[in-house]
Curated annotation (Swiss-Prot):
Belongs to the SepF family. Residues 18-55 are annotated as: Disordered. Its main location: cytoplasm. It comes from the Bacteria. The lineage of its organism: Bacteria, Bacillati, Bacillota, Bacilli, Lactobacillales. This is Cell division protein SepF. The keyword Cytoplasm applies. One of its GO terms (biological process) is FtsZ-dependent cytokinesis. Keywords: Cell cycle, Cell division, Cytoplasm, Septation. It is found in: Cytoplasm. Cell division protein that is part of the divisome complex and is recruited early to the Z-ring. Probably stimulates Z-ring formation, perhaps through the cross-linking of FtsZ protofilaments. Its function overlaps with FtsA. One of its GO terms (cellular component) is cytoplasm.
Length: 179
């Protein structure tokens, strides 16, 4: 679900329905009087019209709910796109933040930046991530995944070569033992 959809739901929550914007009509309440055994209680005459209005109201609510569910199922079938960016200068970070503000996921590879520039850019992206309620996860030594709030990233299975392995061997190479 996109940020725009969440914002629309938030606005819809605080707006009044069309039915509640109609002027309030005071309905006549039946008056109960002591009844003799020979008299039958009188029923109000407008009761059938009240139930017809209630049925119409229920039908319109049901129709609106069905449309909402149809829209949600269409949103669920939308494909998720992850943009891959290779920033070369600090100014490229603003484009990445614009993508995040547009509720898109971005995979950022800092391989074409110096370490100082990459840290500066990463600080900027981290601040924007907190403001926009996004997530920033490190997925490789120079790669980060920046996602909006509605995307969950599970990176517990990803092991970075710098964390667990020491020595001069790659991810799937065996260490040469000196004898």
């Amino acid at each position: 679900m996109s940020l725009k959809d969440r914002f629309d739901r938030f606005i819809d929550y605080f707006t009044e329905d069309e039915d509640s914007s109609l002027p309030y009509e005071k309905r006549d309440e039946p008056v109960f009087t002591p009844v003799n055994s020979s008299q039958e209680p009188a029923l109000p005459m407008n009761q059938p019209s009240q139930s017809a209005g209630t049925k119409e109201n229920n039908i319109t609510r049901l129709h609106a709910r069905q449309q909402e569910l149809a829209n949600q199922s269409q949103r669920a079938t939308d494909k998720v796109i992850i943009d891959v960016r290779y920033p070369r200068k600090y100014e490229d970070a603003t484009e990445i933040v614009d993508l995040l503000a547009g509720n898109e996921s971005i995979l950022i590879d800092f391989q074409y930046m110096t370490e100082v520039q990459a840290r500066r850019c990463l600080d900027y992206l981290d601040g924007a991530c907190h403001v926009l309620a996004g997530n920033l996860k490190k997925v490789a030594s120079t790669m980060y995944l920046l996602t909006p709030v509605n995307v969950i990233v599970n990176v517990e299975d990803i092991r970075l070569p710098d964390e667990d392995q020491q020595g001069e061997f790659g991810f799937d190479m065996k260490r040469n033992r000196v004898r």
